[in-house]
């Protein structure tokens, strides 16, 4: 089983890295990009000892407690069972 976790800054939180990437894109000719927000992506291989519901609960807690800063970041968890 594979868990995918996407961590992004909450709306309203300033994103200087995203702004820098947006500025660089415009500078080198990538026009038409309105905004860039940066984030983090994690792939977590699970050992199969948990069913899908347990795995989601386990990874959600891990994402909240370890992978993100809940004050300024949101996260999304996807579980792939193949």
Where do the PLM segments sit?
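Short Gly/Ser/Thr- and Asp/Glu-enriched loop/turn motifs at secondary-structure junctions
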Residues: 37-41
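Short, conserved beta-strand segments within well-ordered enzyme catalytic domains
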Residues: 43-45, 76
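Solvent-exposed residues in well-ordered beta-strands and their adjoining turns
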Residues: 6-10, 47-49, 80
């Amino acid at each position: 089983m594979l868990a995918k976790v996407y961590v992004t800054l909450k709306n309203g939180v300033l994103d200087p890295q995203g702004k820098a990437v947006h500025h660089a894109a415009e500078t080198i000719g990538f026009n038409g990009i309105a905004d860039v927000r940066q984030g983090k992506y994690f792939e977590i291989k699970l050992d199969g000892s948990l069913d899908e519901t347990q795995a989601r609960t386990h990874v959600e807690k891990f994402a909240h407690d370890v992978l993100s800063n809940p004050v300024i970041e949101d996260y999304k968890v996807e579980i792939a069972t193949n």
